[in-house]
Amino acid sequence: GTGTSGNSSSSSSTGTSTTPTVSTATAYEDDTKSITIETYERNNTQIHVATVKIKGNASIKTALANETYGRNVTAKTSTTAKSVNAILAINGDYYGARDAGYVVRNGQLLRSESQNASQEDLVIYKDGSFGIIKEGDITAQQLVDNGAMQVLSFGPALIENGQVAVDSSDEVGKAMASKPRTAIGIIDDSTYVFVVSDGRTSESKGLSLKQLAEFMKELNVTTAYNLDGGGSSTMYFNGQIINKPTTNGRNIEEREVSDIVYL
């Protein structure tokens, strides 16, 4: 409906909303970006990959559920995506499930408490580059001072310097589990991949973190990072949910989460 467009009409005045030249169920293109959706099958699992090419002044952004920062503020990925006119969105780090871990969104420092010294975060800088940091090595304020636009605190890093970064210690426990996954990666300074793999469904067994990292390497990313998975894992594109979100392993339904990463 037209009722919601009033809230976001301000975005059009920035000159970033452009008329799409391509807009289908698997492809989108306008003056600033092109996005294509492909589905792969690996390890008996469907993996949905959105390849983003930046052509103009578009950038990866984040949005909070209900435009509000808080521990108990959640909404479905698709709901938050629609509220910011996202073409492509994935669930973020679900910062609200934890009371520590750096949170920087669209350049705003929202949480500076460190989860622990070894916590690996993804930093997306103003120039579009990705970095992986450990919270023990740098403060959230220093990251913002260094040009961080987004800091996502989940992990682990999947690929660093083009190599698989998931080590054997990650393989104990959560890394071995096969479940839905969400990840983001950078190929070069204008090309990114948003990745969501299914799991716990009849069609998809699910990936371990090692398998996910190996798949990201196949996509030729230089840096890739694991975001919140399981029932949170959702990919939204051009008005539709692309994957099969599983709230409890049975229902195909979206989980409400704290935040999204989008264009």
Which residues fall in each region the model found?
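Short, glycine-/Ser/Thr-/acidic-enriched flexible segments
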Residues: 42, 55-57, 95, 137, ...
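Beta-strand-turn-beta hairpins that frame and shape the catalytic cleft
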Residues: 45, 57, 128-129, 186-193
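Short, solvent-exposed aromatic-acidic interface loops
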Residues: 64-69, 136-140, 197-201
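Active-site-adjacent helix-turn-beta-strand microarchitecture at beta-sheet edges
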Residues: 28, 93-175
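Conserved, well-ordered active-site substructure
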Residues: 99-116, 124, 169-186, 191-222, ...
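Zymogen propeptides
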Residues: 1-116, 120-121, 131-132
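Conserved hydrophobic/aromatic beta-strand scaffold that supports enzyme active sites
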Residues: 47-51, 157, 183, 260
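Loop/turn elements at helix/coil->beta-strand transitions in domains of secreted/extracellular proteins
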Residues: 84-87, 129, 163, 189-192, ...
